[in-house]
Amino acid sequence: MSNKLAQLRKLTTVVADTGEIDAIKKYQPEDATTNPSLILKAAQIAEYAPLIDQAIAYAKTQSNDKAQQVQDTCDMLAVNIGKEILKTIPGRISTEVDARLSYDMERSVAKARQLVKMYNDAGISNDRILIKLASTWEGIRAAEILEKEGINCNLTLLFSFAQARACAEAGVFLISPFVGRIMDWYKAKEGRDFAASEDPGVLSVTKIYNYYKEHGYKTVVMGASFRNIGEILELAGCDRLTIAPSLLAELEAAEGELVAKLVDSKGSKARPAPMTHSEFLWEHNLDAMAVEKLAEGIRNFAVDQGKLEAMIAAKL
């Protein structure tokens, strides 16, 4: 019998949640995802120094203003890392829009277009890129605009069912519901551990997946933010799962039969009318965990973006 990672690949598209090329080469995922925290981590690896130098050189041709140079360097660095990753995978790279734009639809759209142009100028076509946006109302509306322009989006920091519904109704390409961070909140709140089958994050993704399939939504469900392989195994059969290298290693070492837990019902239930802005805000607000985790996630990504900018500024 093959290991559980090999079995999982037959049920689910496996994505690597890392910006580290060596890990991607080792596990050969279909796609890869990055975020500001992973870009910051990757930028501190010696082999990436030339990518930083090239990004700085590019930025200096774009502006004489140091603050603008920092912004342009960070954007080009994310694209440079994405380009390197794309050399080793057959599918798509997810590159994230600055988290500080999470509540600004117009600037999110502009930043997304800029990142895509950088990829396009390097010979990378749109069908190999996903633009990551936080699943705020503004982020979802930005994605709706971008999707109509042929720019596929990955809506991240998704914690509530309201966020999931709004994303499907906006026709976004893919969502990344966070499993582990949901579990973290309930573990802290209730002071107990959860069996994988009862894990609140697992239950959240299962509910979203089943709702999408029952109503015929095409939006891809990609579970993210895992704390252990138990959560991953309970979501076998999900459209995609983005997994950190350490957990990919555990899956590769695990033996035993793996069965699909999520199965596409291919339903055709009538869809409800799309949520209004006020309905979205109210439904999301009713989920205390989601309110806290969305805000925290945006803040934390913004902190790491700031650290990356400080690192770049010191090199200019």
Swiss-Prot record:
Q: Hey, which family's this protein in?
A: Belongs to the transaldolase family. Type 1 subfamily.
| A Gene Ontology BP annotation from the UniProt entry | pentose-phosphate shunt
Q: How does it assemble?
A: Homodimer.
Its function, per the record, reads: Transaldolase is important for the balance of metabolites in the pentose-phosphate pathway.
Q: EC annotation? A: 2.2.1.2
Location comes to: Cytoplasm
* Organism the protein comes from: Vibrio cholerae serotype O1 (strain ATCC 39541 / Classical Ogawa 395 / O395)
Quote the Pfam families the UniProt record gives: TAL_FSA (PF00923)
CDD domains named in the record:
Transaldolase_TalAB
Q: Which domain of life is it from?
A: Bacteria
- Is Cytoplasm found in the keyword set? yes
GO function terms (MF aspect): transaldolase activity
The protein, known as:
Transaldolase
Primary localization: cytoplasm
Q: Does the keyword Transferase apply?
A: yes
**What pathway does this protein act in?**
Carbohydrate degradation; pentose phosphate pathway; D-glyceraldehyde 3-phosphate and beta-D-fructose 6-phosphate from D-ribose 5-phosphate and D-xylulose 5-phosphate (non-oxidative stage): step 2/3
Any one Gene Ontology cellular component term annotated for this protein? cytosol
